[in-house]
Amino acid sequence: MTTLLPALDLAQLDALDARDPLAHKRAEFDLPGDIIYLDGNSLGALPRRVPARLSQVATEEWGHHLIRSWTRNAEAAQDWMALPDRVAAKLAPLLGAGAHEVAVGDSTSVNTFKALAAALRLSGRRVILSDADNFPTDLYVAQGLARLLGDVEVRTAPGDEMTQHFTDDVGVVLLTEVDYRTGRRLDMRAITAAAHARGIVTVWDLAHSAGAFAVDLGGAGADFAIGCGYKFLNGGPGAPAFLYVAERHLDRAEVVLSGWMGHADPFEMARAYAPAPGARRFVVGTPQVLSLSALDAALDVFGDVDLGALREKSLSLTDTFIRLMEPLAEQYPLELVTPLAHAERGSQVSYRHPHAQQVMAQLIECGIVGDFRTPDILRFGFTPLYLSHGDVGRAVAGIAAVLDELEGPA
């Protein structure tokens, strides 16, 4: 049986939690008491305020007021019609964006298509460059757009060599700020500057960034960005995604999926499309009221959160996990693939293990919920709003027990 000699004892973990300025946020989530949830980077936990909001929307707004709810109480910001704009206004500060630069709705994949198409038009070039190991949907969407347009080429390159492939024929670079497998965080500001120096338009995927730490799209000079609402933003399964368009591009970026909800006056029922002001023009169809309402309520959790403290806790949690895992990495075939440098780390920690799928299945069975990514990645997500350092210690103890049971020390 392995003897775990942690770098931090339980008293130290308790002391870290006692000083945690975000400790009170845990009570705002409905978390099962029999698990340690390290998978908020796949699906965020349920904020307690969401069920009541959904019940209100379903029984009162839909059930009682019916179609009147589309415009009812607009002066009090309670109408459905402007719900995407209200959600965008709550989300924008987490992205370092203005509310008018953010559109909320559709899925991440659909928004990626919109962003890539608009970015290509702006660039006047025909090559999309992406990380060879980018999240598959980003690559699939780029490939589909290339097939549709016919004269567009999709190129890929290793992530750590990306800027070396910024050639004069590249029009758009599509990158994910935090790698979904390793948790490695890219330097958005530096890469964007390098892209702009070569006349390249940037599209950033923030799926593993938004809600995990403060994103600064404006400060980084990003052109476009997309992301989902169901991971660190806790908007629930299938939550609407978002699309960011830098203000300098709003009047020039072409809306290739032009729908009536992106029209300047939808109920004019005009025969020709006229774009709405700001990023709202990128909203395509009828707002998904139920899922938008869930995301709207979930974002209220961030209302009193200092984003600097959020990042500090994220790094403290992941530092603690890495230190506590060191004895296990010495005894078992565990390879840390997440960077140690804070500037290069998101809010997850990943290890390679030859039997990662089996190990993760057993961990989940024991109540330690992370996830597996092919071919050999154990992935653990750390959501600062509802995880504690004590959770980290208990998780590592559970991981040690599972590894002992499955294979014994290497």
Swiss-Prot record:
<keyword id="KW-0662">Pyridine nucleotide biosynthesis</keyword>
<dbReference type="InterPro" id="IPR015424">
    <property type="entry name" value="PyrdxlP-dep_Trfase"/>
</dbReference>
<feature type="binding site">
    <location>
        <position position="286"/>
    </location>
    <ligand>
        <name>pyridoxal 5'-phosphate</name>
    </ligand>
</feature>
<comment type="pathway">
    <text>Amino-acid degradation; L-kynurenine degradation; L-alanine and anthranilate from L-kynurenine: step 1/1.</text>
</comment>
<dbReference type="GO" id="GO:0009435">
    <property type="term" value="P:NAD biosynthetic process"/>
</dbReference>
<dbReference type="Pfam" id="PF22580">
    <property type="entry name" value="KYNU_C"/>
</dbReference>
<feature type="binding site">
    <location>
        <begin position="135"/>
        <end position="138"/>
    </location>
    <ligand>
        <name>pyridoxal 5'-phosphate</name>
    </ligand>
</feature>
<feature type="binding site">
    <location>
        <position position="230"/>
    </location>
    <ligand>
        <name>pyridoxal 5'-phosphate</name>
    </ligand>
</feature>
<feature type="binding site">
    <location>
        <position position="109"/>
    </location>
    <ligand>
        <name>pyridoxal 5'-phosphate</name>
    </ligand>
</feature>
<dbReference type="GO" id="GO:0097053">
    <property type="term" value="P:L-kynurenine catabolic process"/>
</dbReference>
<comment type="similarity">
    <text>Belongs to the kynureninase family.</text>
</comment>
<dbReference type="GO" id="GO:0019441">
    <property type="term" value="P:L-tryptophan catabolic process to kynurenine"/>
</dbReference>
<dbReference type="InterPro" id="IPR015421">
    <property type="entry name" value="PyrdxlP-dep_Trfase_major"/>
</dbReference>
<feature type="binding site">
    <location>
        <position position="205"/>
    </location>
    <ligand>
        <name>pyridoxal 5'-phosphate</name>
    </ligand>
</feature>
<comment type="function">
    <text>Catalyzes the cleavage of L-kynurenine (L-Kyn) and L-3-hydroxykynurenine (L-3OHKyn) into anthranilic acid (AA) and 3-hydroxyanthranilic acid (3-OHAA), respectively.</text>
</comment>
<keyword id="KW-0663">Pyridoxal phosphate</keyword>
<keyword id="KW-0378">Hydrolase</keyword>
<dbReference type="GO" id="GO:0005737">
    <property type="term" value="C:cytoplasm"/>
</dbReference>
<comment type="pathway">
    <text>Cofactor biosynthesis; NAD(+) biosynthesis; quinolinate from L-kynurenine: step 2/3.</text>
</comment>
<feature type="modified residue" description="N6-(pyridoxal phosphate)lysine">
    <location>
        <position position="231"/>
    </location>
</feature>
<dbReference type="GO" id="GO:0019805">
    <property type="term" value="P:quinolinate biosynthetic process"/>
</dbReference>
<feature type="binding site">
    <location>
        <position position="260"/>
    </location>
    <ligand>
        <name>pyridoxal 5'-phosphate</name>
    </ligand>
</feature>
<comment type="subunit">
    <text>Homodimer.</text>
</comment>
<feature type="binding site">
    <location>
        <position position="108"/>
    </location>
    <ligand>
        <name>pyridoxal 5'-phosphate</name>
    </ligand>
</feature>
<feature type="binding site">
    <location>
        <position position="208"/>
    </location>
    <ligand>
        <name>pyridoxal 5'-phosphate</name>
    </ligand>
</feature>
<dbReference type="GO" id="GO:0030170">
    <property type="term" value="F:pyridoxal phosphate binding"/>
</dbReference>
<dbReference type="GO" id="GO:0043420">
    <property type="term" value="P:anthranilate metabolic process"/>
</dbReference>
<dbReference type="InterPro" id="IPR010111">
    <property type="entry name" value="Kynureninase"/>
</dbReference>
<feature type="binding site">
    <location>
        <position position="176"/>
    </location>
    <ligand>
        <name>pyridoxal 5'-phosphate</name>
    </ligand>
</feature>
<dbReference type="GO" id="GO:0030429">
    <property type="term" value="F:kynureninase activity"/>
</dbReference>
<protein>
    <recommendedName>
        <fullName>Kynureninase</fullName>
        <ecNumber>3.7.1.3</ecNumber>
    </recommendedName>
</protein>
<dbReference type="InterPro" id="IPR015422">
    <property type="entry name" value="PyrdxlP-dep_Trfase_small"/>
</dbReference>
